[in-house]
């Protein structure tokens, strides 16, 4: 289980803390969703859990072991909102072999198959893929690393309805093997497969029952549609 206890993040350049008093418990092989508007601190929390930023105070545990930056980098794999900005390989094969030069073609194919990209040519450029395919490829990159926790920052943002449904279906399959933590400003589809949920606002996190959050978002979306 992932435990976060009283975590805060207050960089010296900021007058106010970006995150304050964060508590979170996420059991293994479950999917948790954090919902909040832009600027609420949700992406910063993802960066901290991925070991890309160091929290100012508080503790992070996995299976009762407290984690530092190095352990977090090994434990967690992150898929960014715009993964295409982070692709470095000229082809899908090169992308998946970054850091794994001895990776066999069979293992590459297996990883691509796990994310529904098994029919693609390994010589295809990552930048030639659609937005949904790029997010799937970014997931395949992380699956090859074999992290314990998959972190996803706005995985459905900017995708059409069909692509969103496909991605949500994929995440439902992945949570049978991995622990997933997802942040989103609009988690309507994601809540269909979520086991637990939180709302974040002004750097403060509050746990909320999934059914209650779904009802709130339905009302909000209905009002927005009428407007």
Where are these regions (language model features)?
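Conserved H-loop
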Residues: 178-183
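Conserved ABC ATPase "signature" region
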Residues: 105-121
